């Protein structure tokens, strides 16, 4: 409370306020979480004199110490305490020359804290159940406490007879469906707590089977073969009378001990001795054990074997999970635990249930578990970036009683250095990281069980940076010398590695006479050859990370040009250059005109021959196709096949094709190359079976089906067939076009296999494909329905080329193309667990996948989420290495198998199943919430835009795909803010600290500042290793 003396002082100081002194900054009221820091700012101006500042707390002058101190005119409070620091703060500015004082308006400090929650019963009767969630905590002046109610593990909301009123839960007309354990959670800025002990509500079963009996009818003796309907009065609360009590000679002699305390890991048993009279041995009697009101185990006493880890009843209030530690002994009713774990703590009660009678229960027994002292998780060593503002090392311990955590530094002086402190949760905090913080630190956890410790190594590093980056492109002539600079700084000293076309260079695999690797990282190439042309990359790295820069080397061959004559004058040289240029231009024009005329003549002759051939093959039944010149000009989206072969392979058209290869028609060569590639991908439509439509995509329907195992070839088989066909084409026709096709195809395969995986990993994938040759392959089939839509056909071909060029276990395989008739089918690899988004929703409990006797899959752990993200990064890196872009990367377009293998795919169900995630922009359906700004503004898709989408995918993974990115905004708002550059992104709450910085860099507006997939893969690999420790 503010004392009278403090009020008088404040009034006196306000009365002597100098007119020349005014506050520029006044302290503001604040709400802060307990144990965090707070700062009150205060600044006043006086043009002529020096000012002195002081602070009052609740009217009393503050006694400064290490925790509460004044820096300049500002007041700093470290580790705020709610018992001492709550109240009003006033800043006093004193003019030392005149003695005039000025007092600021009071600023209120509120402390946010949260300790515990408990469920209190306010009233219970037949018409209403009233519960209250009592919370020990405060939220200050911020948002009020958020209260959530749970029945068993189900979250409650206002619906039907359930009403949520602030801290209270009201259930009107409660019935048997409202039975269960009620708990509440409270959350604010300080954290989230759940009530340790809830309230168990169990409505009394009120049904007495009174059936009218006729003289000539008898009751069925076997209860399990007859069903009776018991109805109560209409309009009554329950409408049924209570069940009769069991006979007195059926009773529980001894129940569990009222309270037992067991150490974690030790065995124990809960007693339930009962007496069963002989006349009831043939009746159906069940022995049940309940934990916290939920059914845990039960067994029939009428002759059936004991049920271990299984039950006939699998209702929503049951805890009947598979657990070999728990055994229910039928003979004496004892429930034994092979070894106690922390989750076994609770209230236990045994029951006997005679059919058509009310159950009898033992007195409840409380089982308390003394949890072993341990670290959860184990503290790990960490690299801290030099000059980082804040860095944290976590140390969390569990045990009974709650352990105390402290940190010491190894060495002679165990005290922590300056700017290093420990918060209330045991986290070691480094502020303004410097080299003195380097060393070994030990975390000590202590309670009555003893003490445990864990030592971590803290290393202060500097991220590698280019001091002299490689600059290009570099042009040089053959036989010349080229120098490519690459110098780096960092701590530890970075290593420098050069590569050419993604193949590492070293003294062992290069010509030492021509290639020199200097100590400062510079690469010098002497006597440059034509084969030295390519893309050179310099990678620098240390324990703090990796960086890479590329430079292009262009080698110009020496021609047979005219050597300049020293004796001639400048005018002669200019005249000769002009004459040569005009002569070459004239010759080029004549050549082009002649080729155009000749190509036109040859094209007309080829069309006439092809029309004659098609007429003969059709038996003369297609005169229009043969005779109509316009019809032959139009080409389909993808050329169709006849009897499994393309028309271009017919014997009669071989001469035309051969003659056309000598022409300079770029379009003709491209179309023949595409037809040749599509011919290699041909699959018979009869090989597909059990097609089930799962949705519609941008160019047609999408199905899931099965493909005959005999039609599934390994990637190595496809390569061999391709080379064989190219060789035959080359030997048979002698055309230059087929040779270029072979060379380009082999180069594409080399590029697709040069990724983060080495050749051994590709061999392992091929071996796995051979092992599965005896089974039917699950496939995804995409139909091309919009044959006349040029944009749809172009996208269909792009996806074909993308998936055909990639041979990586992180990307689905393209098995082939069915072109026998419309619609064309693209056949892709599929998995038994389907698309990744549905899997995430199932593990989050948003999709009901539980069957009878089973439960929903548990949520993914952080290690599992990191493993999924890592596999997607590897697959996208393979796409980047093959010089392709995905353009629609999301969890809905990835698939996962039961072996937890994730692959990048392309279902793109944008028309129905995932239509909510697409928006029509500029007459095109786009996944705008996953697209980079340059894609929406300029329709520019690059690998950097795929990296932007990958950051959103990781956000989806850590949110279990339960919500859309920026779901609070409409699609139009997302487009507007993305184009304006005001769309703000933040990582998911569950993201590890080591990944936050690199994931945020995926969403920067400048694409050049975004990381590469290899950098993301390295960061994820390091995070996975940390999570496993």
Swiss-Prot record:
Q: How does it sit in the membrane?
A: Single-pass type I membrane protein
Residues on Cytoplasmic side: 599-1029
- Describe the function of this protein: Acts as a calcium-dependent, homophilic cell adhesion molecule that regulates neural recognition during the development of the nervous system. Component of the repulsive Plexin signaling response to regulate motor axon guidance at the embryonic stage. Also component of a receptor complex that is required in the adult visual system to innervate the lamina layer; specific targeting of R1-R6 axons.
Residue numbers bearing the Phosphoserine modification: 674
Mind telling me which SMART domains this protein's record contains? IG, IGc2, TyrKc
Q: How does it assemble?
A: Interacts with plexA; component of a receptor complex that mediates the repulsive signaling in response to Semaphorin ligands.
Which keywords belong to this entry? Cell adhesion, Cell membrane, Disulfide bond, Glycoprotein, Immunoglobulin domain, Membrane, Neurogenesis, Phosphoprotein, Receptor, Repeat, Signal, Transmembrane, Transmembrane helix
Extracellular compartment segments: 19-577
Q: At the top level of its lineage, which domain of life is listed?
A: Eukaryota
Q: What is this protein called?
A: Tyrosine-protein kinase-like otk
Is Disulfide bond found in the keyword set? yes
Q: Which GO terms describe its biological process?
A: cell adhesion; dendrite self-avoidance; homophilic cell adhesion via plasma membrane adhesion molecules; imaginal disc-derived female genitalia morphogenesis; imaginal disc-derived male genitalia morphogenesis; internal genitalia morphogenesis; negative regulation of canonical Wnt signaling pathway; photoreceptor cell axon guidance
The reply to whether Glycoprotein figures as a keyword in the UniProt entry is yes
Bias kind Basic and acidic residues: ranges: 716-727
Q: Where in the cell is it found?
A: Cell membrane
Listed InterPro entries: Ig-like_dom, Ig-like_dom_sf, Ig-like_fold, Ig_I-set, Ig_sub, Ig_sub2, Kinase-like_dom_sf, Prot_kinase_dom
């Amino acid at each position: 409370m503010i004392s009278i003396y403090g009020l008088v002082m404040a009034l006196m100081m306000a009365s002597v306020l100098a007119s020349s002194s005014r506050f520029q900054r006044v302290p503001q009221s604040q709400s802060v979480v307990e144990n965090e820091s707070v700062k009150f700012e205060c600044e006043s101006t006086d043009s002529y004199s020096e000012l002195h500042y002081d602070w009052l707390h609740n009217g009393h002058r503050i006694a400064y110490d290490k925790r509460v101190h004044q820096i300049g005119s500002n007041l700093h409070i470290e580790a705020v305490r709610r018992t001492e620091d709550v109240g009003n703060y006033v800043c006093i500015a004193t003019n030392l020359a005149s003695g005039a004082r000025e007092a600021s308006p009071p600023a209120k400090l509120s402390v946010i804290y949260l300790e515990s929650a408990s469920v209190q019963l306010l009233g219970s009767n037949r018409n209403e159940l009233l519960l209250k969630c009592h919370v020990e905590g405060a939220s200050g002046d911020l948002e009020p406490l958020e209260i959530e109610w749970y029945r068993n593990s189900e979250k409650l909301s206002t619906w039907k007879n359930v009403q949520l009123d602030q801290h209270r839960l009201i259930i009107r007309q409660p019935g048997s469906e409202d039975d269960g354990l009620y708990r509440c959670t409270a959350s604010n800025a300080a954290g989230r707590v759940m009530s340790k002990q809830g309230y168990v509500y169990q409505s009394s079963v009120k049904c007495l089977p009174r059936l009218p009996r006729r003289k000539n009818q008898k009751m069925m003796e076997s209860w399990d073969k007859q069903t009776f309907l018991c109805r109560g009065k209409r309009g009554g609360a329950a409408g049924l009378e209570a069940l009769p009590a069991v006979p007195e000679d059926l009773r529980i002699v001894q129940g569990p001990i009222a309270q037992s305390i067991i150490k974690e890991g030790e065995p124990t048993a809960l007693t339930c001795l009962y007496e069963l009279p002989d006349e009831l041995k043939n009746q159906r009697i069940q022995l049940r054990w309940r934990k916290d009101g939920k059914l845990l185990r039960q067994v029939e006493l009428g002759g059936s074997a004991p049920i271990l880890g299984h039950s006939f009843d699998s209702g929503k209030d049951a805890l009947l999970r598979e657990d070999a530690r728990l055994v229910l002994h039928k003979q004496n009713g004892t429930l034994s635990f092979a070894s106690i774990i922390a989750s076994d703590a609770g209230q236990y009660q045994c029951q006997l249930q005679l059919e058509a009678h009310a159950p009898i229960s033992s007195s409840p027994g409380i089982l308390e578990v003394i949890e072993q002292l341990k670290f959860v998780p184990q503290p790990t060593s960490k690299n801290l970036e030099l000059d980082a503002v804040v860095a944290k090392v976590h140390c969390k311990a569990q045990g009974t009683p709650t352990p105390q955590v402290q940190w010491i530094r190894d060495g002679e002086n165990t005290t922590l250095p300056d700017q290093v402190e420990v918060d209330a949760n045991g986290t070691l905090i480094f502020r303004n990281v410097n080299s003195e913080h380097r060393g070994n630190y030990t975390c000590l956890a202590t309670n009555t069980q003893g003490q445990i410790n864990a030592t971590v190594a803290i290393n202060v590093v500097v991220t590698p940076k280019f001091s002299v980056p490689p600059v290009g492109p570099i042009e040089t002539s053959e036989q010349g010398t080229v120098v490519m600079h690459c110098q780096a700084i960092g701590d530890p000293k970075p290593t420098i590695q050069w590569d050419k076309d993604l193949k590492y260079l070293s003294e062992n695999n290069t010509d030492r006479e021509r290639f020199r690797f200097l100590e400062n990282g510079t690469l010098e190439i002497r006597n440059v050859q034509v084969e030295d042309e390519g893309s050179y990359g310099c990678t620098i790295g240390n324990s703090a990370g990796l960086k890479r820069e590329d430079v292009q080397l262009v080698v110009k061959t020496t021609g047979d040009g005219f050597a300049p004559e020293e004796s001639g004058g400048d005018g002669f040289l200019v005249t000769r250059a002009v004459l040569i240029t005009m002569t070459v231009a004239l010759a080029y024009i004549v050549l082009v005109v002649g080729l155009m005329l000749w190509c036109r003549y040859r094209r007309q002759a080829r069309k006439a021959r092809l029309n004659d051939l098609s007429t003969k093959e059709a038996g003369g039944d297609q005169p229009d196709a043969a005779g109509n010149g316009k019809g032959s000009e139009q080409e389909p989206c993808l050329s169709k096949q006849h009897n499994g072969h393309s028309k271009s392979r017919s014997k009669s058209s071989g001469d035309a094709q051969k003659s056309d290869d000598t022409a300079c028609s770029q379009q003709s060569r491209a179309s023949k190359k595409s037809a040749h590639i599509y011919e290699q991908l041909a699959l018979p439509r009869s090989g597909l079976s059990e097609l089930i439509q799962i949705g519609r995509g941008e160019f047609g329907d999408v199905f899931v089906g099965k493909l005959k195992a005999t039609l599934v070839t390994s990637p190595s088989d496809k390569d061999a067939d391709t080379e064989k066909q190219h060789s035959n084409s080359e030997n048979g026709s002698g055309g230059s076009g087929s040779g270029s096709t072979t060379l380009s195809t082999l180069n594409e395969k080399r590029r697709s296999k040069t990724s983060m995986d080495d050749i051994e990993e590709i061999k392992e994938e091929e071996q796995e494909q051979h092992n599965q040759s005896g089974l039917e392959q699950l496939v995804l089939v995409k139909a091309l329905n919009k044959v006349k839509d040029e944009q749809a056909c172009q996208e269909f071909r792009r996806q074909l080329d993308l998936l055909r060029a990639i041979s990586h276990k992180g990307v689905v395989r393209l098995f082939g193309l069915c072109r026998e008739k419309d619609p064309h089918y693209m056949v892709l690899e599929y998995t038994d667990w389907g698309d990744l988004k549905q899997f995430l929703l199932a593990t989050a409990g948003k999709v009901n996948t539980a069957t009878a006797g089973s439960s929903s899959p548990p949520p993914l752990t952080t290690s599992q989420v990191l493993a999924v993200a890592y596999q997607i990064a590897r697959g996208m890196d393979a796409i980047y290495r093959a010089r392709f872009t995905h353009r629609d990367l999301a969890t809905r377009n990835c698939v996962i198998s039961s072996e937890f293998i994730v692959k990048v795919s392309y279902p793109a169900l944008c028309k129905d199943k995932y239509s909510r995630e697409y928006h029509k922009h500029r007459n095109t359906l786009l996944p705008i919430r996953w697209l980079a700004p340059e894609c929406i503004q300029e329709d520019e898709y690059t690998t950097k835009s795929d990296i932007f989408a990958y950051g959103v995918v990781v956000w989806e993974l850590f949110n279990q795909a339960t919500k859309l990115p920026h779901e609070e905004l409409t699609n139009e708002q997302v487009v507007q803010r993305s184009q304006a550059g005001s769309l703000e992104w933040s990582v998911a709450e569950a993201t590890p600290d080591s990944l936050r910085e690199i994931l945020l860099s995926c969403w920067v507006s400048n694409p050049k500042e975004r990381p590469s997939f290899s950098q993301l893969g390295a960061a994820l690999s390091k995070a996975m290793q940390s999570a496993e420790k």
